[in-house]
Amino acid sequence: MLQRVSRRFPSLRRCGLRTASTVPTNQAQPGEVEEEVSATVKRIRSELAADKQKLKWRTPIGDRPEDWNSKLKLFSNAEQTSDFIVMMQKPIDLSPRNIRQWWENREERIERHMQQFVPERHKILGAELAAAHFILYRGGAVKFINDTHWRRASKDGEFKLPNKFDPRYKVEALRCDNMELYYEGLENLRCLDSLKFLSFHNVKSFDDWCLDRISGGGFPNLEVLDLSCTQITSNGLACLYRFPKLKLLILNDPKETLELELSTVMLEEAMPALKIVGADAIHS
């Protein structure tokens, strides 16, 4: 019946279609949605750019257009640190003591730079030989697996080691005693899977930060660690849990302070195979 009515009144059907097309709805057209989204994205981006501009650090003095610049600015240090600023604010002191201190600080900065990790050296030599070259060049001693003696550099600083990777050389022990070794240079001691003995006896610059770096160097088989005559405190001993096979730890005096004694007792309790002794029992 409805079909007959629709055939009899075709005009009514056309009118209904026109009415439906003109009735307002809550759904937006696809083009309108895209325009609204793009406008919102543009607004958010503009707000983020404005916020970044507000949060940006102030322009350094001398880089602003209204600042006066001297011709000597060509010789200024672009990376001026707080130490440099403090130095420039101090009165000029040309006393022998101050000149000697300045020279020592300069030599230390140069040595720290020279001890930095060189990726190319490790790519050519491998981790084992790269560590051996680094230690021998600075007056240390190295012992490889199946070697019957320690290897040291001659008086002229020369030593015989391969100048490219050789899988037969596996470092078993390292002696860094009395060396001038800094935090930057410790990164050269890494991934020594066969290392069992490591000594930093009388390395004055070796502190808790250095021990933390060494503990993350990847020495899974380390058994003996000598930290006597260094700047190690009770705070640095907490990272020794990273040496699961550590059996002997040498310190100046495990009972030097109450904090150090408590730390050593807790460390021995956490690592039953570990024995902590004083330097007098080893280096006497």
From Swiss-Prot:
Q: Which GO terms describe its cellular component?
A: mitochondrion
* InterPro entries on file: LRR_dom_sf
Note the SUPFAM superfamilies from the entry.
RNI-like
Entry's Gene Ontology BP terms: mitochondrial respiratory chain complex I assembly
The entry's function note states: Involved in the assembly of the mitochondrial membrane respiratory chain NADH dehydrogenase (Complex I).
The record's similarity note reads: Belongs to the ATP synthase subunit s family.
Q: How does it assemble?
A: Associates with mitochondrial complex I assembly intermediates during its biogenesis.
For this entry, the protein name equals: Distal membrane arm assembly component 2
Species whose genome carries this gene: Drosophila melanogaster (Fruit fly)
